[in-house]
Amino acid sequence: MSPTTTPPPAPVAAPTSKGAKRSLMSSLMDATALLRSSSFKEDSYVAAALPASELRALADLKALLATHPDPISIWGVPLNPRSPPAAADDAAPVDERADVVLLKFLRARDFRVRDAHAMVLRCAAWRAEFGADAVLDEELGFKDLEGIVAYMHGWDRDGHPVCYNAYGVFKDRDMYERVFGDGDRLARFLRWRVQVMERGVRALTLRPGGVNAIIQVTDLKDMPKRELRAASNQILSLFQDNYPEMVARKVFINVPWYFSVLFSMISPFLTERTKSKFVIAREGNVAETLYKFIRPELVPVQYGGLSRTGDLENGPPKPASEFTIKGGEKVFLEIDGIEVQTNADSSGCKETTW
């Protein structure tokens, strides 16, 4: 996996069957490239670091929102505090969080101001209709999925909160029917998934120079791809429309051989910017991949880390010691009074003696 290779643009399907086949193969090749790359670099929200064109777009978006008579607020951040009813009050405080939120919508629409403006209005309308601001207080009946299917746990090396997703439990048919058996159950699950996302948003500062996005880790082991297609597409669409630029990096782990096929199905729902955030780890390479972004004491034990359920309730854990053993080196470790001898041969293979 190389962080320097940029994934190629998603292909545009041709109308002929031959062209469609080429399009599918291009999608599969695109997915294969993603197995080796992640080109995304998180953008700054500090005004002094923004180019003049982006500052102009931000000012134009604010001006458009200021024409709305009703207050607009997303994630608890007022976006048009100087709308017409309050325009005469020049002393009205300016919330610096508004710049962060509006820049997210602008980046999601490549700084096309009118498109970003429309996206803000649709998101605000959806949040009002969905009741997103109150969803954290709801009991949705998924206690048995907490800490298994979707949950916030720890943070990465840069302070981003980490959300883990694992849908392998739904290979059990009874579990699948209980959660996704009909439209009402699926709607309740989607509401619960939004609830988890809102927890992640609550953990962000949403301020220039602060932590303004989360990390998503998705475990594809045993994931029933066909059965979860409808739910996956709805979650992707809902999050892209209403949580723009909320994910700093998307890490897929335990990736099976058919991932390229799965990617070709979800690719039309993803922007190129979103796909540039992907990091892929096949089975057997999970811990090594996660350690690049998350310290071992914060990685769950099921993924090769040291963190167990409840470990973070009493504050941050004691940092783990990290080091690299080169070929031919001999290192002595002492773990809770037990001496461990670790040898590495010239090929880098390690042998541990207790």
Explain the meaning of each model-derived region.
Residues 2-354:
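Basic, amphipathic alpha-helical/coil surface patches used to engage anionic, phosphate-bearing ligands
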